[in-house]
């Protein structure tokens, strides 16, 4: 009896060991559990920060009523004004346009992207600076957005906030002060995500159209944002069976509806997730970023993303829903770098 019990304990111990190995298999740095220490808590759409990422924006130059985005940004500091350098990244060309937004203490502001950058789809990075355009530690910015797409997808998404890990922010001067490098290394700014997850993918056969939006975060914004490159992913059904997939893209924002064509799996998606069933996926870029000029190495690429679901039966079925959310962050990159131009705020 004792021998049988001991054998059972050994089997359980082996299973826990294997489970721990599987959990640590994702590339990148594990997200920390202790969020009580400043600099440990990572990017989130439920907090304030010195950098905000709005994961998608769009607008139609012809019919802004049908396709548009409203950006909302708030300065939660009750004493100090905020200078915010906005960077609008074209998801297809990776070209960058910019503007300054200045907020007084406790002020909030909203604008339509059809007024500032009509006809472009991409993402926005907002950086807190001083009046001279130099990045500073100012963990009081928060934001959200309302987005509607001509396909019928819509969502209210919180802006991802990245706070600084220290009040003494070390801003690396580039090109003799013409530009500044933002280091997301857990020492200056908090780290950015590497492995992303979509925790629920409903069946297409039930009227669901799930759109995926992926953003490469990094690059020299005086030249252009970095491109995504190659991906690898794992797709699970609700019975824990798994298949892998891969794909490549030459843009800095990738947008596609989950279907039998994307991601290409064997068997196809509709077989893996049939009517009445669901699944989930995690994915990550397989390339590297050369961060050696900033004290790094060939580091993992940083990624953020959004998932938007549209169900054509929403008004006729109790189990049909539409909306969107930011993707879950599974692991982090050791270092990500954004280089921004530096010049005085124009407001």
Stretches found by the model and what they are:
Residues 10-20:
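Bacterial N-terminal signal peptides
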């Amino acid at each position: 009896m004792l021998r049988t019990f001991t054998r059972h304990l050994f089997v359980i111990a082996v299973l826990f060991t294997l489970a721990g190995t599987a959990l640590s298999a994702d590339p990148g740095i594990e997200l920390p559990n202790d969020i009580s220490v400043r600099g440990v808590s990572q990017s989130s759409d439920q907090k304030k920060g010195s950098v905000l990422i709005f994961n998608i924006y769009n607008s139609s130059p012809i019919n802004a009523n049908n396709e548009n985005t409203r950006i909302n940004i708030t300065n939660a500091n009750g004493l100090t004004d905020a200078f915010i350098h906005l960077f609008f990244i074209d998801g297809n060309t990776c070209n960058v346009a910019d503007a300054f937004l200045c907020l007084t203490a406790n002020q909030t502001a909203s604008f339509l992207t059809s007024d500032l950058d009509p006809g472009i789809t991409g993402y926005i990075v907002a950086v807190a600076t001083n009046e001279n355009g130099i990045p500073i530690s100012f963990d009081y910015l928060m934001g959200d957005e309302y987005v509607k797409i001509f396909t019928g997808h819509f969502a209210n998404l919180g802006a991802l906030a990245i706070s600084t890990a220290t009040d003494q922010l070390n801003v690396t001067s580039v090109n003799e002060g013409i530009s500044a490098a933002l280091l997301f290394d857990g020492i200056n700014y908090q780290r950015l995500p590497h492995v992303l997850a979509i925790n629920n993918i409903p069946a297409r056969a039930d009227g669901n159209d799930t759109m995926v939006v992926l953003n490469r975060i990094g690059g020299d914004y005086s030249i252009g944002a970095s491109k995504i490159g190659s991906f690898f992913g794992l797709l699970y059904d609700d019975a824990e069976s798994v298949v892998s997939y891969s794909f490549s893209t030459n843009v800095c924002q990738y947008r596609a509806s989950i279907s039998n064509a994307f991601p290409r799996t064997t068997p196809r998606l509709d077989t893996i997730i049939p009517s009445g069933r669901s699944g989930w996926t995690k994915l990550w870029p397989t390339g590297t970023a050369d961060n050696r000029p900033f004290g790094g190495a060939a580091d993992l690429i940083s990624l953020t993303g959004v998932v938007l679901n549209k169900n054509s039966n929403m008004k006729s079925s109790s189990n049909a829903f539409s909306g969107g959310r930011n993707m879950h962050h599974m692991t982090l990159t050791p270092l990500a770098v954004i280089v921004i131009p530096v010049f005085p705020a124009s407001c």
